[in-house]
Amino acid sequence: MDPTELKRVFQMFDKNGDGTITGKELSETLRSLGIYIPDKELTQMIEKIDVNGDGCVDIDEFGELYKTIMDEEDEEEEDMKEAFNVFDQNGDGFITVDELKAVLSSLGLKQGKTLDDCKKMIKKVDVDGDGRVNYKEFRQMMKGGGFNSL
């Protein structure tokens, strides 16, 4: 990230404009962006990069933290794609009722024992109403608690 971009993003986090980001400012801004990192992990991240030991993040330290957060997001996205691909057995970019049933059955889960159960599960997350779950819908469902929330 170039220095101008870094400064712009830093200022977004530095709510009171004092040149440092507190743990609270960091947590609130990440949550507003849809990134949920447990407080304990956030504290550990800050401790790792807080070179001057003041408990806050300055712009130089923020550059390191930003890189760490983006790396974690990339890793989470990769895991999400792998999970989607397990369900999308034919690789067409969609999870069908039959694919959902096959995977849930192979996992021995009571959810999805019947095609009707699977149709109901898909209907709950099928935003575009095509009877299938695309990656975006799958991702949204998983961020909302996964299959247990259905």
Swiss-Prot record:
The entry's Ca(2+) 3-binding residues are D88, N90, D92, E99
Question: Residues that bind Ca(2+) 1, according to the entry?
Answer: D14, N16, D18, T20, E25
Q: Cite the Pfam families for this sequence.
A: EF-hand_7
Glycosyltransferase as a keyword of this entry, yes or no, is: no
Q: Say yes or no: keyword Repeat present.
A: yes
Q: Which superkingdom?
A: Eukaryota
Residues holding Ca(2+) 4: D126, D128, D130, R132, E137
Q: What is this protein called?
A: Calmodulin-like protein 7
Q: Which organism is it from?
A: Arabidopsis thaliana (Mouse-ear cress)
Origin organism lineage:
Eukaryota, Viridiplantae, Streptophyta, Embryophyta, Tracheophyta
Q: Which gene encodes it?
A: CML7
